[in-house]
């Protein structure tokens, strides 16, 4: 459950195998996710959790770098850090995946429901929770899964602590970042900011990305806590260009989000959480003639959003219920300033009222995990989402888990491609079944396998010849396999294989890679960790076999090497040097020749803590 390729582990000792403990197969260490406050052994869904320490060992710049290593998650292309990219989870595209930061959605509902994971910096992140499969009963619009990002909290032991980091690489690609945090008298603070700039590791893919996040907490007498957060990000980036076809595309993305949260313990077995949030999301898409610098397409969108939630948790992780009420309003404004294509302009307001309940009921080795959610939307159909999951312990080292669910995702909140000039009100919906097992029965080895089958309908598909949006039914089934070993003299191995077969339900035709991700995906990693020497090394591999049109390079294996060396290993605040060599063998991967994965490139940097 708590897996990322090359996560470091402690050696097996008299306290038992760290692999067993970290996966929740013992009761010593909880590993739940935010909406499901349970130990890892009581989660029916297919979940991966990535921690801040694991992220640091990858020398990652953004969430996209981290997702590249997560089993079952695939990116279309990794190019320059901070660039725009697409992604999928077990064949479900990014339009069906909810992305949140501290409970604030990041998806542009008017722009393919895309959240820009390449524009979420990792320095602020405490952990990333990836739920692979329909999760609407707890999360709402999440037909294909959830990427939930939890940012760091203020440190409690010191009045001030911090970090400064800098790196430089190919094509003047730089990443400058810093953070400062501390607590005193019940008040805590966490501040971070930085920039990523590049002339483009790939031609036409230059990046100018700035970001900042602040968080203030106050602990009341009696255990209540208030948290105020503000997140600001902007990015101007080149997307692609081609001298052969004489065109270019650039984009810009702006995020300004804030929230205020209050958590109040009502008793030993009851907690109330109240949150208010709001912000603005802006996006621009510019396309033009490269030789003349003239635009033939210039689209802008703005989404002003606000939301309020109240949730009550009763009981504990083994016997409990979490219920909640939510309200959300999103104002959408769209303009296309050159072609004035019909349906490209819009002024809409989407409102959503929601109520949900999720529970855990444990009897001996069996746990039942039901959930239900009801949404009322002013512009769309009203969905009812439900899930029923279960886990069953088979001894102390093997766990069966599975769930069946019905969920939804929002359609495009736009008139673009409309047949009748009206907004499509039918939701994109899914029924899913997943089941599998997780075991540490083999000494020093952890294994997990999940089988999945998804039936999806009302999937929007733009017909470029007719200029209209059509809908289709799709089915996806496959298997997601993972393994990892306990360390041996500092070395550890992880591996994963994902098979996805995506079909058009009506015709039986295989879906292309843009609709269902790669048919075969293999991820593996070899790590070495020597705490006494202050050295950690990570070698990752990522193989993907995409179903793409002729002329593409759909099959490739990308290898990356990351090395971190502390100069004073005995000190927690030791300065640290690091370097990364990405795409070691300069593999070629692309759908179109003018938009390729990043070639081999190198970067070096350092971190200083205080």
Regions found by a protein language model. Name each.
Residues 86, 104-132:
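Short acidic/polar hinge/loop motifs at secondary-structure boundaries
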């Amino acid at each position: 459950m708590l897996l990322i390729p090359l996560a470091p582990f402690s050696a097996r000792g008299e306290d038992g195998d760290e692999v067993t403990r970290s996966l929740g197969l013992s009761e010593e260490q909880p590993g739940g996710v935010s909406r499901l406050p349970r130990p890892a052994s009581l989660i029916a869904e297919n979940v991966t959790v990535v921690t801040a320490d694991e992220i640091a060992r990858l020398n990652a710049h953004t969430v996209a770098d981290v997702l590249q290593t997560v089993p079952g998650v695939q990116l279309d292309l990794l190019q320059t850090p901070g660039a725009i990219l697409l992604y999928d989870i077990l064949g479900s595209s990014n339009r069906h995946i909810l992305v949140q930061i501290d409970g604030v959605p990041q998806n542009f509902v008017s722009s393919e429901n895309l959240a820009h994971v390449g524009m979420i910096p990792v320095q602020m992140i405490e952990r990333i929770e990836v739920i692979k499969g329909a999760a609407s009963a707890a999360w709402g619009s999440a037909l294909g899964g959830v990427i939930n990002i939890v940012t760091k909290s203020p440190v409690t032991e010191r009045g001030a602590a911090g970090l400064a980091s800098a790196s430089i690489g190919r094509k003047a690609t730089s990443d400058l970042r810093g953070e400062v945090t501390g607590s005193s008298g019940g008040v805590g603070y966490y501040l971070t900011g930085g920039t990523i700039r590049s002339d483009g590791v790939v031609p036409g893919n230059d990046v100018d990305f700035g970001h900042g996040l602040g968080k203030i907490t106050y602990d009341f007498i009696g255990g209540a806590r208030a948290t105020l957060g503000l997140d600001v990000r902007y990015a101007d980036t080149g997307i692609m260009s081609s001298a052969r076809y004489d065109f270019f595309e650039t984009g810009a993305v702006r995020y300004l989000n804030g929230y205020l949260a209050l958590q109040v313990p009502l008793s030993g077995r009851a907690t109330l959480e109240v949150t208010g949030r709001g912000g603005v999301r802006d996006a621009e898409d510019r396309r033009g003639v490269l030789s003349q610098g003239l635009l033939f397409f210039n689209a802008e969108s703005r989404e002003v959003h606000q939301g309020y939630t109240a949730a009550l948790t009763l009981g504990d992780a083994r016997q409990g219920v979490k219920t909640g009420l939510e309200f959300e309003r999103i104002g959408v404004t769209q303009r296309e300033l050159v072609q004035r294509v019909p349906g490209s302009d819009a002024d809409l307001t989407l409102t959503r009222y929601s109520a949900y309940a999720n529970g855990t009921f444990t009897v001996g080795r069996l746990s039942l995990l039901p959930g239900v959610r009801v949404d009322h939307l002013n512009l769309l159909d009203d969905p009812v989402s439900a899930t029923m999951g279960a886990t069953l312990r088979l001894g102390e080292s093997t766990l069966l888990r599975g769930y069946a669910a019905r969920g939804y995702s929002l359609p495009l909140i736009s008139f673009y491609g409309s047949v009748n000039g009206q907004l499509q009100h039918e939701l994109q919906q899914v029924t899913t079944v997943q089941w599998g097992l997780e075991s540490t029965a083999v000494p020093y080895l952890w294994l997990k396998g999940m089988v999945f089958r998804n039936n999806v309908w009302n999937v929007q598909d733009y017909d470029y010849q007719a200029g209209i949006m059509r809908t289709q039914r799709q089915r996806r089934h496959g298997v997601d396999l993972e393994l990892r070993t306990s360390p041996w003299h500092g070395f550890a191995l992880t591996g994963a294989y994902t098979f996805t077969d995506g079909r058009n339900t009506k015709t039986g035709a295989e879906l292309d890679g843009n609709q269902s991700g790669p048919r075969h995906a293999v991820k593996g990693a070899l790590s070495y960790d020597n705490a006494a020497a202050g050295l950690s090394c990570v070698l990752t591999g990522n193989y993907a076999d995409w179903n793409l049109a002729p002329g593409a390079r759909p099959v490739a294996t990308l290898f990356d090497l990351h090395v971190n060396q502390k100069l004073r290993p005995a000190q927690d605040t030791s300065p640290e040097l690091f370097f990364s060599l990405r795409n070691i063998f300069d593999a070629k991967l692309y759908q179109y020749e003018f938009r390729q994965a990043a070639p081999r490139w190198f970067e070096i940097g350092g971190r200083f803590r205080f």
